[in-house]
Amino acid sequence: NWTIQNVNIIFPQDEEYINYWFSAWNSFVVFNSPHSKTFSILREQYLLAIERLAMSPENWDAINNPFERLAEHLMLLYGRGQIEIDDPLLKKFWNSSPIRIRSHALRFIGGSLRSTKEIIPDKTLIRLKKIWEDRLRAAKSSPNQEESQEELEAFGWWFTSGKFNDAWAYKQLFQVLQTSGKIGDVVRVLEKIY
């Protein structure tokens, strides 16, 4: 396959060619959705992109932000069952990404849930609950509680999606408020409660 044979030419990994790598990677991640076949070919590039997240500028165009799109790709791959919660890609992503990128990942899931009209399969909801509970645990044990607040605020979008059973959703909402004192999408959260 031509792509497999040329992946290291398309995405040169030497530091001297970093600008070429960013051009190819940013174009790929912004203008494509993750697919299982492509992911298996580009897994190493995903890892390299995660390692380079620290280079993400604060003022990147929000619509075409390749760093946020990387987070979206990873969440889609996880939600579809193509990577697991303990996959090295996700571990590295959660452990090394700037807080705004981690928060974006969780808001992306919540926003996607809210905009989806179809019934989401139970196995997908179980996976999503698992990743949320993992992030909540990480936030509770984080030495940087202020930073964790931003990540936890994303649960507002999950809560207002209406995709989870009320017992689980209200329990998570209570834990978020108890841990961080803040919630995103607050107006819709209040509308749902009242």
Label the predicted regions.
Residues 1-194:
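Non-catalytic all-alpha helical scaffold/repeat segments
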